[in-house]
Amino acid sequence: MRGRRRAWRGAWRGGGAADLSLLCPQVAYVRARELHTLEVTGLETVAQSKAHVASLEGLIPEDKVVLLAGSPLQNEATLGQCGVEALTTLEVVGRRLGVHNV
């Protein structure tokens, strides 16, 4: 694997339905400029995860979109609602023209 790996443990308790299979912290990967290892429960929102990675890399979260298998994720959705499972790789990329509300 390329780049630094940083473990991060999400501790948010947001509302809404969650995938119960992720209630025990599991590892997910986030690729931005570097590859980061995140410990997630599935209750973290996409916006919270994006903001955390942006702070690690000095990025502006509002200028970024989180992708799962090439599809943009909604900021207010939890990772569990988006189908993030153990060992899932998310990508944080620059926002493209025409991509709104994510």
Swiss-Prot record:
InterPro entries: Ubiquitin-like_dom (IPR000626), Ubiquitin-like_domsf (IPR029071). It comes from Homo sapiens (Human). This is Putative ubiquitin-like protein FUBI-like protein ENSP00000310146. Residues 23-99 form the Ubiquitin-like domain. It comes from the Eukaryota.
